[in-house]
Amino acid sequence: MRSEPTQTQAAPRYDLGLVLEGGAIRGIYTAGVLDVLMAHGLQADMVIGTSAGCIHGCNFVSGQAGRSIRYYRKYRRNRHFMGLYALLTTGEAVGRKFCYEEIPTRLDPFDEAAFEASPVDFYVTVTNVRTGRAEHILCPDLRQGGGMEVLRAGASMPLCSRITMIGGQPYLDGGVADSVPYRAAKALGCRRCLVVLTQPAGYLKHPSASQPMFAAAYRRYPAFVETMARRAETYNAQVCEVEQAAKSGETFLIRPSRDTGITRMERDMQTIDAQYALGRADTEAAWPALALWLKATG
């Protein structure tokens, strides 16, 4: 049995880590990738993700292939899941009680026992609103009041989510400060990284038109506002670094082979299914090269 979530201080050594970008509903691509990796029996030592990357990555740790797309198909159109109704009635675009309590404990149970028994370490990226910096928290469990609070904080999108307090510190979506936690994985001692991005090649993030709203909403947290203002620049640099690492053979990269037109808050299940199917297809296509890379770098 593992203990309560703790913020990472030491740097343990890992042979292979999965680095998972977020992207809200767009991240269902990652679920498709992970389901194929599980079908091929891929073994990793750690998973580190941001936002939706963690939402789907936890199912890799618990060994629950197919769970993400299953509950998306069942509940995405439920007004308590995500959207305007949830925002107006709870103050958050993602229904906290429905998504983080009812689904994992009752409607489509998360296998907590398998997660805790797994040898795979699971890190959630969060942004400290006070410092504006990313923190990568090791979650030994995803229990209510424990690791589940960290998971929720890491996927709490600014402007449409409440700040989550953990250990007296305020947190929001990890994507604000560290959308692609590749460097964090290396700093944690990960020798080889398999990185999953959710945007196709050539995508460049541009400064948000909502920056004035961020500045007004979080005026008490100037460091957070500054980090948000630099987000596009930071993201583009991170992707460039991962691309260079993939070219050198140090890292293996899987990303969408095309743009399905999916949005962050997508409701159309055909589009969501297409994004998931693309993740599966891209990973099946990449598997021969990935298997060779794993053997060559092992």
Per-range role (PLM):
Residues 1-50, 58-298:
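Patatin-like phospholipase
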